[in-house]
Amino acid sequence: MCSGVCICLLLAMLSASSKAHQATGSLGEDAVGTEMDQLNLSQLPRYARASSAGQKKSFQRTDGDQRSNIGNALVKYLQQSRKAGPSGRYVVLPNRPIFDQSHRINDRDYMGWMDFGRRSAEEYEYSS
């Protein structure tokens, strides 16, 4: 539950920051707005344009490092969620029972749910 709340807060923060970024982008038509945009771009090197290929590669490495950090965090989260399965938390890969593959209705995705027409098809043998 705590992880769900954290994810919701993270998404709310990201959407708020993107809305704020769009609002500051609309000021770019007048001279004051463009000066503010240039000031912001000079302070954030990630958004600055690279004049040579060497600088461009260094920015790509930073993005790659961030992606690997996010990937590592995701792997750790998935491992923790798998370990915490019996405690009542959501299990990422549930243990599903194995069914007979030769049965004529072999795709049983809806365990415990009545899929329309399937139950009646299992109960009655059709002669045709």
From Swiss-Prot:
Transmembrane segments: none
Region (Disordered) location: 47-67
An example Gene Ontology CC term for this record: axon
Prosequence residues removed at maturation: 21-108, 120-128
Domain of life: Eukaryota
PROSITE patterns membership: GASTRIN
Family matches, as Pfam families: Gastrin
Protein name according to UniProt: Cholecystokinin B
Originating organism: Xenopus laevis
Annotated gene: cck-b
